[in-house]
Each structure stands twice: as C-alpha cells, then as structure tokens.
Design a protein with these regions (language model features):
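Active-site segment of metal-dependent pyrophosphate-handling enzymes
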Residues: 4-6, 22, 56-59, 63-125, ...
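Short helix-coil junctions and helix-kink-helix linkers
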Residues: 193-201
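Short acidic, hydrophobic short linear motifs in intrinsically disordered regions
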Residues: 181-193
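Short, cationic low-complexity segments
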Residues: 33, 128-144
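Short histidine-centered catalytic/ligand-binding loop motif
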Residues: 42-51, 179-180
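N-terminal strand-loop-strand
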Residues: 1-41
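Long, intrinsically disordered, low-complexity Ser/Thr/Pro-rich regulatory/activation regions
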Residues: 106, 219-248
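Charge-enriched amphipathic alpha-helical scaffolds
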Residues: 201-219
Length: 248
C-alpha cells in the first residue's frame, strides 16, 4: 500500500497601495528538459514533518518560503482528491525531487493575511543561505498576483485559491479588514478592499453611510492631496475595540 502524505498550502492574501487584493505565489526555476510549467507558479507549501502538528507546521512552512511570520494564519479547508497530484504535468515536476511522486497527498489549506506594505517584497528571502535544503525544489522568487488575474498554478492550487477567497468572503468583517489595510486608510481604500473580496461593485454612498454608522472606524487628523479638485481625502483608523479583537 502506498503512503499517504500530508502537506500544507498557504494562501497569503495581501493588500497594497495600488488598491489591489493580491495572493503571494512562489515562482520556481524552469528547466526546459524536465519542468512542466513555464515559470511554475504555486502557493507556498510543503509536506509536514512526521512529528509536527498542523499549526506549527503551517507557521514553519510559511516562514521558510516567504520570510514572513507572526501574522494571521488560520486553517480553512482540506483538499483530499486522490488524483490531486496525478496530472501528467505535476508528475513530471514531482519526479525531479521525490522518490515516489505518485504517492497520494492530502493538503490542509491555511489562509494568511498581511498588508503588503509592511513586508519586504524583494526576493532576498529566497537566497540559498536562507532557504537551505529547500533549494533542491527550485524555489527562487515570490510574486504578488491580483486575485482576479491568477495564472495557471501547479496541482490544484487554483482551486485552493478560489476556496480561500470564498472563505474570506464568508468571514469578512472589520477585524480582518484591519489586518489587510494600513493603519491610516481612506474610505475608497476600504471600499475597494470589500469589492475585491466580495467580487462585486458596492454603492459608494450606501457603503460610507453604513460604515460610519457602525462606529467601527474613527476619523483622524491626517489628510492627503489626491491631485484632483475638491477636498483632500480624509484618513481613518479602526477603533481600539476592533484592534483588540484581532489580537485576541
């Protein structure tokens, strides 16, 4: 009987100053003789160790492949299709570094949230001395892809991203929004984040009326010149109650 492996794949959502919700992907080295995907984009993921529990393994894997740690990280689903790594493209790539590439792999999906501006987005985390033995798998760069423009990914990772976005949509609240947004943000930034997650346009007037009525955000003294005629844009912050909820 073949062995069943357990892996963890992390869907790291980030929001940036371009007002785009994005997903962090790992771009692996391309060997034209053996690689199946030109650029081979995938989610940050790896097999768990024999003596690891899931949550510590998720933190280890995310940090080892992205350099990012101590962030919101939560299990959201399990992907157990017996054929999820059996596609010829995937098998061709797996043979590069696994003795038994045909073995079944059940993956546990974790969702992670960051504000992109808070983290270094260059590829320095992927130098050989940082990755160590993981360089055998060819990791060498990380990229942020817009959620509405995800390229073809390895294995069933496109489906995992879709399920993670559904989970985020279902769980969307101001606590999660406060993680993705900068400390000081404008109402257009907040509205665009909600639109990206919900996948639809929101009426500007109704959105602002509802948000301000809830009292979850407070106006700051900061303003910015948008370069357009009219009043400068006002910055807001989530109130202390929201911030404490996130910490808990």
């Amino acid at each position: 009987m073949s062995q069943i492996n357990i892996s963890i794949d992390c869907v790291l959502f980030g929001y940036d100053s371009d007002l785009d919700l994005k997903v962090l992907l790992i771009k692996r080295k391309y060997d034209p003789n053996t690689a199946a995907y030109k650029d081979h984009n995938s989610l940050p993921g790896d097999l768990i160790k024999y003596d690891e529990e899931l949550s510590p393994a998720a933190s280890r894997i995310l940090e080892s492949l992205t350099g990012i740690s101590d962030i919101y990280l939560k299990q959201f689903s399990i992907f157990s299709d017996p054929n999820r790594v059996k596609h010829p493209k995937d098998q061709k790539w797996l043979r590069k570094f696994r003795a038994l590439p045909e073995e079944r792999v059940i993956t546990v999906g974790y969702i992670a949230l960051v504000n992109i501006e808070d983290f270094n987005t260059d590829a320095t985390y992927f130098k050989d001395e940082i990755i160590g033995e993981l360089t055998r798998e060819g990791y060498y760069e990380k990229i942020w892809a817009k959620v509405n423009d995800i390229p073809e990914l390895a294995f069933d990772h496109n489906n995992i991203v879709e399920e993670a976005l559904k989970y985020l949509k279902k769980e969307l609240n101001h606590e999660l929004s406060s993680i993705l947004l900068p400390k000081n943000f404008t109402l257009p930034q907040l509205q665009k984040l909600y639109e990206d997650i919900l996948g639809k346009k929101i009426d500007k007037r109704n959105f602002r009326k509802q948000i301000l009525k809830e009292g979850s955000i407070v106006k700051t003294k900061h303003t910015t010149n948008t370069g357009k005629k009219g009043k400068p844009a006002t910055f807001y912050q989530f109130n202390d109650t929201i911030k404490e909820t996130v910490k808990d």
